[in-house]
């Protein structure tokens, strides 16, 4: 048996190639799969369940169809942190906490999106704290669709411009943050995304596995009792 992990697909109507690759992934055989975990940033942007576009509802239907075969779990990313119970219900995904612990074939394992590990990026962490305040989410939910989309587009533009000025080092998972979180939860293994740097890191605190993004290829982490297997395929298939 195996368990699959994906993340950072950044699905949008503007990238039909990614959407097609995701649908091919969902159409494969899952007979020997225990569960599928989506570790955030399933969508490029999400401004609220109440104004989900037809594209997103089609994706929800695709995911729901697979849910009849196996459980599907979702952890919020920094792009789709506003996905709520309404969308989870129609897509048949089970929402998990920001940091979730599972027993993965005998190994206590932490699952998370990964942006909380980039602690050297002080500016982003301040924004992240502000963004997660319940009152901020409440005010945002009361805005019109056009206003929410405008704010989201502005934030993405600022983030892209700001990231070009930051070193790759501060935008990666900080080793002490990784070690502290593993120690806090008494785990020796962690799986996350966000950084778009797929790799298997064997560190003193434990094993850290990073799932890749889907911008130029599909990226799937397969976990079995024998260990991890990071898989990548061209978006066009084959």
Curated annotation (Swiss-Prot):
Mn(2+) 2 binds at residues 41, 78, 113, 194. It holds the Pfam family Metallophos. Gene3D superfamilies: 3.60.21.10. Substrate binds at residues 78-79, 121, 159, 163, 166, 194. Its EC number is 3.6.1.54. Mn(2+) 1 binds at residues 8, 10, 41, 196. It catalyses: UDP-2-N,3-O-bis[(3R)-3-hydroxytetradecanoyl]-alpha-D-glucosamine + H2O = 2-N,3-O-bis[(3R)-3-hydroxytetradecanoyl]-alpha-D-glucosaminyl 1-phosphate + UMP + 2 H(+). Its cofactor is Mn(2+). Binds 2 Mn(2+) ions per subunit in a binuclear metal center. InterPro entries: Calcineurin-like_PHP_ApaH, LpxH-like, Metallo-depent_PP-like, UDP-diacylglucosamine_Hdrlase. Hydrolyzes the pyrophosphate bond of UDP-2,3-diacylglucosamine to yield 2,3-diacylglucosamine 1-phosphate (lipid X) and UMP by catalyzing the attack of water at the alpha-P atom. Involved in the biosynthesis of lipid A, a phosphorylated glycolipid that anchors the lipopolysaccharide to the outer membrane of the cell. This is UDP-2,3-diacylglucosamine hydrolase.
């Amino acid at each position: 048996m195996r368990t699959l992990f994906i993340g950072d697909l950044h699905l949008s109507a503007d990238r039909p190639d990614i959407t097609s690759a995701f649908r091919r992934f969902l159409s494969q055989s899952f007979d020997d799969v225990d569960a599928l975990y989506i570790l955030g940033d399933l969508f490029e942007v999400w401004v609220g369940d109440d104004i989900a576009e037809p594209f997103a509802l089609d994706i929800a239907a695709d995911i729901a169809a697979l849910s009849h075969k196996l459980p599907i779990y979702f952890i919020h990313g920094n792009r789709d942190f506003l996905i709520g119970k309404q969308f989870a219900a129609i897509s048949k995904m089970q929402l998990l906490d920001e940091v979730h612990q599972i027993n993965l074939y005998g190994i206590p394992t932490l699952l998370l999106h990964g942006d909380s590990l980039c602690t050297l990026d002080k500016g982003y962490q301040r924004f992240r704290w502000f963004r997660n305040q319940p009152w901020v989410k409440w005010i945002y939910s009361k805005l019109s669709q056009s206003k929410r989309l405008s704010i989201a587009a502005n934030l993405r533009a600022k983030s892209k411009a700001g990231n070009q000025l930051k070193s790759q080092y501060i935008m990666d998972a900080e080793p002490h943050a990784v070690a502290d979180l593993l120690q806090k939860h008494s785990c020796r293994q962690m799986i996350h995304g966000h950084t778009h740097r797929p790799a298997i890191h064997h560190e003193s605190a434990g094993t850290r596995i990073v799932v890749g993004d889907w911008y130029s290829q599909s990226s799937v982490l397969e976990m079995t009792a024998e260990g991890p297997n990071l898989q990548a395929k061209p978006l066009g298939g084959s």
